[in-house]
Design a protein with these regions (language model features):
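Multi-pass alpha-helical transmembrane bundle typical of ion/small-solute transporters
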Residues: 1-271
Length: 271
């Protein structure tokens, strides 16, 4: 078998597992925390998988076979070498010990030029600052009216807040995918045929079901440490702010950025 093909398959498989196990929990963590008491893990996994399949299909359709939503426009496809597979392997090790790291820089640094990396760094720094500022302002305002531990939700609003978690989590998950799928798709041709697309969808679905089965793994512990992530109102606010910041930068330009930095900025501002 051609070594390039082996490196491609290994790199893609490791990147897929590492990204889904690491960054996706930063995105879906509040969803798992606030819903696991009410729904079986496979129901939650099925919901997340459905959004993922739709997001990948839409990106593939809208961007002429490119599931990265155009994030890799400035990073041309390269023949995969052994060192390209090292980055996701390191990421996998860090994930196993529960360290949330930036998959974007760890993976794409093996492919991108210095100029592109500098622009990615600047975009991520701005994303961190914006998320921290928005979260800080939002929680100052919200804390004046809501204390999840003591202010119970009025019965007539319970359904609204529980449903809002589903909607906001779905939006956040789609926006996140439009950013971070690039960290996996970088190992694949920029235009995928339908067979490869279906294979990618199947692999991601298996990974998602596994991650939900283990309830997020060690990275989920980082999310659970933050006050309020188990509550529907706080989970919704976290989701909306995170998704809004990511959506803004998605529309800003086609440069990849670190969603982990935005996540950390959000938690920093909130704390």
């Amino acid at each position: 078998m051609d070594l390039t093909l082996i490196y491609t398959v290994v790199g893609f498989a490791l990147a897929g597992y590492s990204v889904i196990a690491n960054d996706s929990i930063q995105t879906l963590g509040t969803f798992i925390a606030s819903k696991k008491k009410w729904f079986k893990w496979y129901v939650l996994a099925g919901s997340a998988s459905s959004v993922m399949i739709i997001a990948l299909a839409w990106g593939w359709y809208s961007y002429d076979g490119d599931i990265s939503y155009g994030r890799l426009t400035r990073i041309p496809y390269q023949e995969i070498q052994w060192y390209h597979a090292v980055a996701p392997a390191i990421l996998l090790l860090l994930t196993r010990v529960g360290i949330p790291v930036s998959t974007t820089f760890l993976v794409l640094s093996a492919f991108a030029s210095t100029v592109v990396l500098e622009k990615m760094l600047m975009k991520s720094v701005v994303g961190y600052g914006l998320a921290a500022m928005v979260a800080y302002i939002a929680w100052i305002a919200v804390s004046k009216f809501i204390n999840e531990k003591f202010d119970e939700v009025d019965d007539k609003w319970i359904g609204f807040w529980r449903n809002s978690v589903w909607i906001s989590s779905g939006w956040l998950w789609w926006v996140w995918l439009s950013h971070d799928v690039a960290n996996i798709a970088v190992y694949l041709p920029r235009q995928l045929d339908i067979t490869i697309l279906l294979t990618v969808m199947a692999y991601f679905t298996i990974l998602l079901f596994y991650i939900f089965y283990i309830q997020g793994g060690r990275i989920q512990a980082v999310v659970l440490e933050k006050t309020g992530t188990r509550y529907a109102r706080s989970a919704t606010i976290i989701n909306v702010i995170y998704a809004a910041v990511l959506f803004y930068f998605k529309e800003l330009n086609d440069l990849p950025m670190s969603t982990t930095w935005v996540f950390v900025g959000l938690l920093c501002g909130r704390e």
